[in-house]
Amino acid sequence: GSPGACSPETSLNREWSIERARHTYSIPHWSEGYVDVGADGRLLVQPRGPGGPEVALAEVIAQARHRGLELPVLVRFVDILGDKLRRLQRAFGTAMADHDYDGAYTAIYPIKVNQHRNVASELVANGEHGFGLEAGSKPELMAVLALSRRGAIVVCNGYKDREFLRLALIGRRLGLDTHIVIEKPSELTVALEEAAALGVEPRFGVRLRLASLGAGKWQNTGGEKSK
């Protein structure tokens, strides 16, 4: 070869390593322990976090092709959702124990964040205790009522007409722990009327708005015109 040319053996290939691969692709900074580089250089996914079962992404792609699928394909590792939920609940549990807080913590997932059935179903399956769903519209509420287990907490937010309120109260008759968040007096009046008609005891929550206006990026979250 020409003077000064580097062969693969004396340049990049010789210097490449697992640690360099992790650093080059900043894997520790974005993976949260769910993705790593294996000893053979392949990308590994650990859906239940470090130390849990792992699968090489290349093997997933090979299986997809074997089944006749063509790339690109969308691969979802839904076990990550359950692990993230458990991490969240453990974090609050630890903080409450450290500060001698004797209350309870319930993780509420607003279904509007991701309405995909697999996402909501996986969270419900992993959140038997201390977990609930939030609905902000009639279509969302119907989906939440169908997904939730008996006794589960359901938070009802957003615009609430008579039909929405009646649907939320029907949830109580189905054995769900539905909470209607009251934002204006008229909602309370209608909810009480519908509760009496259905013969159920309603549960209400109240949305509080800060009267004072702060300063900074989020200053508009307070004051009389805040959401």
Predicted regions and their residues:
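N-terminal amphipathic/basic-hydrophobic helices that include classical n-h-c signal peptides
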Residues: 1-8
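Charged, compositionally biased N-terminal leader segments and the immediate start
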Residues: 8-43
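A generic structural signal for ordered alpha-helices
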Residues: 12-13, 21, 55-66, 97-101, ...
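A short linear-motif detector with a strong N-terminal bias
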Residues: 13-16, 22-24, 52-53, 86-87, ...
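Low-complexity, highly charged intrinsically disordered N-terminal segments
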Residues: 32, 37-115
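Active-site-proximal beta-alpha core segment in soluble small-molecule metabolic enzymes
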Residues: 99-227
